[in-house]
Design a protein with these regions (language model features):
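Active-site phosphate-binding and catalytic loops of NTP-dependent enzymes
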Residues: 70-81
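Catalytic NTP-binding/metal-coordinating core of nucleotidyl cyclase/transferase enzymes
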Residues: 1-65, 69-72
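A short glycine-enriched loop-to-beta-strand structural element that forms part of the catalytic core
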Residues: 81-97
Length: 104
């Protein structure tokens, strides 16, 4: 599973404090859902999360639960405080590599 906040890069340029606040809320919502569905967060890149799961049902359940939780959260907030994410799903073998240690 890959997640990414919509508009986060622009927001960090416009209002860094708000961007960091929303990122913390984002993490408070998403992390427990991934954990509940036996997922593992294997990488973070700013506002993006890469998580792995052993079963396809766990991936789908997590994606639906995350979008539902964010929708409920966003109803209570103004447009400028909305957290909107994109989620990409893939099922199959995953190869993770630490590119920091690769010499070019």
């Amino acid at each position: 599973m890959f997640t990414d906040m919509v508009g986060y890069s622009k927001l960090t340029g416009d209002d860094q404090n708000l961007a960091l606040e929303l990122l913390k809320e984002h993490d408070k919502i998403i992390e427990p859902i991934i954990n509940k569905n036996q997922g593992a967060i294997v990488k973070r890149i700013g506002d993006a999360i890469v998580a792995t799961f052993s079963q396809s049902e766990q991936i789908i359940d997590s994606a639906v639960e995350i979008q539902t939780a964010l929708k409920k959260r966003n109803i209570r907030n103004t447009k400028s405080r909305q957290i909107v994410i994109r989620i990409g799903l893939h099922y199959g073998d995953v190869v993770l590599k630490n590119l920091k240690n690769v010499k070019s």
